[in-house]
């Protein structure tokens, strides 16, 4: 179940104000954020946002295809190291 249309998309206020400032000045800087739940809006396209994954900030370049998704979708929090190796060779 999605968010109500009358509410509009969620975006953290501090993140929105930083992006609007950069758009007014026509600047491109890396913006650090911990707000993984913020929705990507069209005014964010072209910016690089460093999204926190629990350990470090992962730089995410925003493209048009990402609009409508959440920032956290592009900064994975878990590292897959493969399934456990079988010990069949040791049992021979």
Swiss-Prot record:
<keyword id="KW-0689">Ribosomal protein</keyword>
<dbReference type="GO" id="GO:0003735">
    <property type="term" value="F:structural constituent of ribosome"/>
</dbReference>
<dbReference type="Pfam" id="PF00203">
    <property type="entry name" value="Ribosomal_S19"/>
</dbReference>
<dbReference type="GO" id="GO:0000028">
    <property type="term" value="P:ribosomal small subunit assembly"/>
</dbReference>
<keyword id="KW-0694">RNA-binding</keyword>
<comment type="function">
    <text>Protein S19 forms a complex with S13 that binds strongly to the 16S ribosomal RNA.</text>
</comment>
<keyword id="KW-0699">rRNA-binding</keyword>
<dbReference type="GO" id="GO:0015935">
    <property type="term" value="C:small ribosomal subunit"/>
</dbReference>
<dbReference type="GO" id="GO:0006412">
    <property type="term" value="P:translation"/>
</dbReference>
<comment type="similarity">
    <text>Belongs to the universal ribosomal protein uS19 family.</text>
</comment>
<dbReference type="GO" id="GO:0019843">
    <property type="term" value="F:rRNA binding"/>
</dbReference>
<keyword id="KW-0687">Ribonucleoprotein</keyword>
<dbReference type="InterPro" id="IPR002222">
    <property type="entry name" value="Ribosomal_uS19"/>
</dbReference>
<dbReference type="GO" id="GO:0005737">
    <property type="term" value="C:cytoplasm"/>
</dbReference>
<dbReference type="InterPro" id="IPR020934">
    <property type="entry name" value="Ribosomal_uS19_CS"/>
</dbReference>
<protein>
    <recommendedName>
        <fullName>Small ribosomal subunit protein uS19</fullName>
    </recommendedName>
</protein>
<dbReference type="InterPro" id="IPR023575">
    <property type="entry name" value="Ribosomal_uS19_SF"/>
</dbReference>
<dbReference type="InterPro" id="IPR005732">
    <property type="entry name" value="Ribosomal_uS19_bac-type"/>
</dbReference>
């Amino acid at each position: 179940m999605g968010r109500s249309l009358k509410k509009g998309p969620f975006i953290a206020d501090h993140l929105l104000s930083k992006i609007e400032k950069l758009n007014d000045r026509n600047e491109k800087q890396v913006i650090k954020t911990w707000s993984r739940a913020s929705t990507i809006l069209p005014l964010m396209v072209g910016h690089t946002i460093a999204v926190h994954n629990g350990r470090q900030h992962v730089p995410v370049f925003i493209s048009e295809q990402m609009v409508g998704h959440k920032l956290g979708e592009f900064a994975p929090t878990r590292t897959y190291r493969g399934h456990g190796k079988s010990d069949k060779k040791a049992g021979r």
